[in-house]
Amino acid sequence: MASALEQFVNSVRQLSAQGQMTQLCELINKSGELLAKNLSHLDTVLGALDVQEHSLGVLAVLFVKFSMPSVPDFETLFSQVQLFISTCNGEHIRYATDTFAGLCHQLTNALVERKQPLRGIGILKQAIDKMQMNTNQLTSVHADLCQLCLLAKCFKPALPYLDVDMMDICKENGAYDAKHFLCYYYYGGMIYTGLKNFERALYFYEQAITTPAMAVSHIMLESYKKYILVSLILLGKVQQLPKYTSQIVGRFIKPLSNAYHELAQVYSTNNPSELRNLVNKHSETFTRDNNMGLVKQCLSSLYKKNIQRLTKTFLTLSLQDMASRVQLSGPQEAEKYVLHMIEDGEIFASINQKDGMVSFHDNPEKYNNPAMLHNIDQEMLKCIELDERLKAMDQEITVNPQFVQKSMGSQEDDSGNKPSSYS
C-alpha cells in the first residue's frame, strides 16, 4: 500500500478512536483525489478498516469506487456496499449524510441501468433508517427507494415511508436538492395510484405541484397531469389548487397540459361518448405521457358517476334501462359496474336476477357503532397532535435569530416611514 494511503488509513483509525468526527469528515472530503489515483489498492484499504469502528473511512472508499466512470466488478462492489449499509455505525454516518446519500444515489442509478431494481429495495430501507433522526424526517434516499419500488412493481416496501407525514428534511450538509423532494412526492403519488389509494395519491401530487418554484420543473408538470386525472377519478371534478401555489403553474404548466384540461371539460358534461371521442383525439399525447391507463379509469369513473346520479332519481331500474341511460354496451356490462360499485361501497343496491331489476337503498351506516366512535376518536387525536405541532413550529420560528432580526428590521422601517408628530 502506498505511503499516502497508509497515512489515510492511520488518520481514519486515529480520528475514529478519538471520536473527532468533524475532523474525520474534513479528511475524507479532501482524500477523494488520493483514493481515485490509487484505485487498485482500495480493496486493501477496505481490508485494513473496520466497518463499525471506521464507518466514515469505509464510506469514503466505497463512494470513490462507485464514482469511477466504469465499475470493473459490479457484483463485488454491490456486496461491499450491501454489507457496509447493513453494518455501518449510524451515529458516525450522520456526520457525512451527503456522502452517504450520494453512495445510495450511485447504487440506485447502477441498479436502474442494469434493470435490477428489486435488489436495492431492502438496502435502501436500511440506509434510510440509518440516516433518519426520526420517522417523520425526509431524506433524499426516500426518492431512490420509491423509484426502485416503482420499477420493480413492488410497492408495499415503500408504504411505511409514504404513510407517515413528513415534518422535517434531512439537510445532508447542504446537499439536499429540491429534485429529491419533488421525486419523493411524484413517485409516491404514482405508487398510491397503482394501489388505487387515490385520496393519498392526490395529496402527494398536490405537494409536488405546490412546491415553491421560480422555474418550470418537468416533475411538477407530470404531477399536474396526473393530479387532473386522479381528481376526476376520485372526485368527479378537478380539485382546485391551494392559493399558495406558485404562479408558474398557471403561467407555464397549465398551457402545457391542454389535452388534460379538455378532458376535464368534457368529463364535466357527463357524456361518455364525447369523452371517448376526446380520448381518441388525444390518444397519442396520453400514451406518450404514460397516462392512458389513468385516462381509461377516468372513462370508467364517468360511468360510475352517472350510475350514482341515477340513484338520486330512481328507486328501482332495469339493467337494460340503466345501460341505455348511462351509454353502456348492454345489461351485462351494467350489472358488472353495479356489482363492483356495491362491493366498493360506492352505492347501496341489490339486483333481482329473475327480472334484471336493480333496487337502490339508503346508506345503512347509522354512525353509532363502536368502530365509528373509535374512528372519530382517532381523527380527534390527529387534530390535537397537529395543533401541538403547529404551536411548536410557531415557537421555533419566533425564537429563530433570522426571523427576529428580519422582524426588528421591518418594525424599524415602519417607524422610520411614519411622519413625526412634532414636525
UniProtKB/Swiss-Prot annotation:
Residues 197-365 form the PCI domain. It is found in: Cytoplasm; Nucleus. The modification Phosphoserine is found at residues 407, 410, 423. Component of the COP9 signalosome complex (CSN), a complex involved in various cellular and developmental processes. The CSN complex is an essential regulator of the ubiquitin (Ubl) conjugation pathway by mediating the deneddylation of the cullin subunits of SCF-type E3 ligase complexes, leading to decrease the Ubl ligase activity of SCF-type complexes such as SCF, CSA or DDB2. The complex is also involved in phosphorylation of p53/TP53, c-jun/JUN, IkappaBalpha/NFKBIA, ITPK1 and IRF8/ICSBP, possibly via its association with CK2 and PKD kinases. Component of the CSN complex, composed of COPS1/GPS1, COPS2, COPS3, COPS4, COPS5, COPS6, COPS7 (COPS7A or COPS7B), COPS8 and COPS9. In the complex, it probably interacts directly with COPS1, COPS4, COPS8 and COPS9. Interacts with CK2 and PKD. Interacts with the translation initiation factor EIF3S6 and IKBKG. Interacts with ERCC6. The modification N-acetylalanine is found at residue 2. Gene3D superfamilies: 1.25.40.570. One of its GO terms (cellular component) is cytoplasm. It comes from Rattus norvegicus (Rat). GO terms for biological process: in utero embryonic development; protein deneddylation; regulation of DNA damage response, signal transduction by p53 class mediator; ubiquitin-dependent protein catabolic process. PROSITE patterns: PCI. This is COP9 signalosome complex subunit 3. Residues 402-423 are annotated as: Disordered. InterPro entries: COP9_N, CSN3, CSN3_C, PCI_dom, WH_DNA-bd_sf. Belongs to the CSN3 family. The keyword Cytoplasm applies.
